[in-house]
Amino acid sequence: MLSFVKKSIALVAALQAVTALATPISSEAGVEKRGSGFANAVYFTNWGIYGRNFQPADLPASEITHVLYSFMNVRADGTIFSGDTYADYEKHYAGDSWNDVGTNAYGCVKQLYLLKKQNRNMKVMLSIGGWTWSTNFPAAASSAATRKTFAQSAVGFMKDWGFDGIDIDWEYPADATQAQNMVLLLQAVRSELDSYAAQYAKGHHFLLSIAAPAGPDNYNKLKFAELGKVLDYINLMAYDYAGSWSNYTGHDANIYANPQNPNATPYNTDDAVQAYINGGVPANKIVLGMPIYGRSFQQTEGIGKPYNGIGSGSWENGIWDYKALPKAGATVKCDDTAKGCYSYDPSTKELISFDTPAMISTKVSWLKGKGLGGTMFWEASASKKGSDSLISTSHQGLGSQDSTQNYLDYPNSKYDNIKKGMN
């Protein structure tokens, strides 16, 4: 139980967090305004429409502030391109005509635009890169010419598709030169966004974010203060702390280290967040990323113990969709020191680390106390519905979410139906 002093400290921290989030974000680097409420963002993957059968209409749009549509690929010369044109803008959904006049967007692009019209507080951002498609970022960011190409290409897709901003998922800058080039790349994109807005969108503030590492080997290379100036959001990938690469079973997304069981907590979120803040990132630009999946370990006696293999998964070995958890016969346990949960089945000796709704509530309370900017989830197709939904739990816990409206007017989109607002 908290003492009176600790309660007072907690109250002060909460008031500071509310005060910080009540003020629009500003900086000298072009970020003039961003929503004052909390973000509740979620990644939507275009490959999810296939085997997972998760379509844009399945998103809990009324609970989400930002959809991060992933992923676009990038060439070494800086050009952005679609890795799946069918999913992005060719697939015809129910109600889509094959006889429309002109050049029109279909697929996820049209479906997301329609969702934007129905849910004016839900913004959609174009996410570029990802783990698989980060190979060409170093080259694309290496010169002023390639950075300009990247910025123009990215903003071109944004306006053609009727999106609200750009999210860059570069995993990861490998050294100081790449880290500085990342800043220059982001500055080029920010400049291009503002230039487009001035000419075609009445100065509207389009958003710019990144997916950011939570491991010190990667985040210690970043230019924290400069990132804090140019970005609206830094979406911290505070997960994948343990997995097939680990020597012991461990928590996937724990807040703290556990000194009594260090093997279970090789990384932790609190250290990462503090590093970003100490480096000069405003706390309310940091968004806490959380997994909608679990990582499994086989033939183990428990958390922080040796294991043998990771087993199968929902779509790839060792990774289970949250909606498949906990498995029958497994008991959910939580480490109250580390703030991490897992399921364990003593008969099969399988351990799966994942976040429960109660842990999401704990994390939301924690991030509010830190004055952070909200939550992000990877990724939408793995979620449950109803009271067990992690996205819904976050939505309810955050309370005052970002209510800035999305943008619908794209007069120079190359797609006639987006140009006309789907009217």
Curated annotation (Swiss-Prot):
It is an enzyme of class 3 (hydrolase). The active site is at E171. Gene3D superfamilies: 3.10.50.10, Glycosidases (3.20.20.80). One of its GO terms (cellular component) is extracellular region. Residues 23-34 form a propeptide. It is found in: Secreted. Keywords: Carbohydrate metabolism, Chitin degradation, Cleavage on pair of basic residues, Glycosidase, Hydrolase, Polysaccharide degradation, Secreted, Signal, Zymogen. Residues 1-22 form the signal peptide. This is Chitinase 1. It comes from Aphanocladium album.
